[in-house]
Swiss-Prot record:
This is Minor capsid protein VP2. GO terms for cellular component: host cell; host cell endoplasmic reticulum membrane; host cell nucleus; membrane; viral capsid. GO terms for molecular function: DNA binding; structural molecule activity. The gene is VP2. The keyword DNA-binding applies. Residues 318-332 have a biased composition (Basic residues). It holds the Pfam family Polyoma_coat2. GO terms for biological process: symbiont entry into host cell; viral penetration into host nucleus. InterPro entries: Polyoma_coat_VP2. Residues 306-332 are annotated as: Disordered. A lipid is attached at residue 2 (N-myristoyl glycine).
Length: 332
């Protein structure tokens, strides 16, 4: 451990002298910088005819930093790695050895265990007395105030009083803020849910109100319609019909125009304009209960039905009496 600390101290000292970082010394970048600087100084001395001091002044490198860089060895990172690895191996070996020795050390169950005995004047085997907190029957909060006055420090009474009042004020403000935030969140979520439900009901009611309704009897007369359809089918297929019209010199039918035939599957409900020219919202009598129900108004007929259902659900269930067999006297 001492060798590693000594090497680290030397690295920190070199970093402070040369101006380079400690990471550059450990990784080896500082040695490449030292070699480049030494080659540049030698080039200035050889080619430029300058002295070493003049070359250092020209490159703006202090003499102490240059001396420290030139004194470095290129094998410093390998040496530092070897020292760190040796230290790690030694520490790890000692730690593992101590752990294994502690795990393999025999344990005996004859160690004495200290037992608390606070009732020495009474029965040593007697249990401790139960503690009951003091209850303020007369005035809530009086006992803590009296205890605070009794324990107050005369030399620092103002500091203690200010700390107590400040803490109480802060806790009250924090509690009030939390309750206010929770109330606002609940009210905002409730308002958002109500607004969403109202918007959905409004959109559905507007859709049904402005829709084009048609009355159709197709579901009730499905089988009769199929029967009449198959009865009215011609005996010739479309190819034979076109061949027959071609022989008779009549126009050949290419397709059946359904619009030209007097076949209607439904009757549209006529939409009446608002009376009086006030452009208010109107709805037919048969559609009015549906729209009012979407807005929350229940029609009297539905209301009575719902009340009957609620009464049936809320009414107490009558207990069924168990049938018991009558004991009939046996004939002797």
């Amino acid at each position: 451990m001492g060798a590693l600390l000594a090497v680290l101290a030397e690295v920190v000292e070199l970093a402070s002298v040369t101006g380079l970082s400690v990471e550059s010394f450990i990784s080896g970048e500082a040695f490449a910088t030292a070699e480049l600087l030494e080659a540049h100084i030698a080039n200035l001395v050889t080619v430029g005819g300058l002295t070493e001091a003049e070359a250092l002044a020209a490159t703006e490198v202090p003499a102490e930093a240059y001396a420290a860089l030139t004194s470095l060895s290129s094998t410093f990172p390998q040496a530092f790695t070897a020292v760190a690895a040796t230290e790690l191996a030694t520490t790890g070996t000692l730690t593992v050895g101590a752990t294994v020795a502690a795990a393999l050390y025999p344990y005996y169950y004859d160690y004495s265990t200290p037992v608390a005995n606070l009732n020495r004047g009474l029965n040593p085997e007697m249990a401790l007395q139960l503690w009951f907190p003091e209850i303020d029957y007369e005035f809530p909060g009086l006992m803590p105030f009296v205890r605070f006055i009794n324990y107050i420090d005369p030399t620092q009474w103002a500091t203690n009083l200010f700390e107590t009042i400040g803490r109480y004020s802060w806790e009250s403000a924090q509690r009030y803020g939390q309750n206010l935030i929770a109330h606002e969140v609940r009210s905002a979520s409730r308002e958002l849910a109500t607004r969403t439900a109202q918007g959905f009901s409004e959109a559905v009611a507007r859709y049904f109100e402005n829709a084009r309704w048609a009355v159709s009897t197709l579901p009730r007369s499905l089988y009769s319609g199929l029967q009449s359809y198959y009865e009215q089918l011609p005996s010739l297929n479309p190819m034979q019909v076109r061949d027959l019209h071609r022989r008779l010199g009549q126009p050949i039918p290419n397709r059946i125009a359904l619009e030209e035939q007097a076949i209607k599957s439904a009757e549209y409900v006529q939409k009446v304009d608002p009376p009086g020219g006030a452009n208010q919202r109107i709805a037919p009598d048969w559609l009015l209960p549906l729209i009012l129900g979407l807005y929350g108004d229940i029609s009297p007929s539905w209301e009575s039905t719902l009340e009957d259902i609620e009464e049936e659900e809320d009414a107490p269930q009558k207990k069924k009496r168990k049938r018991t067999k009558k004991n009939t006297p046996r004939s002797a």
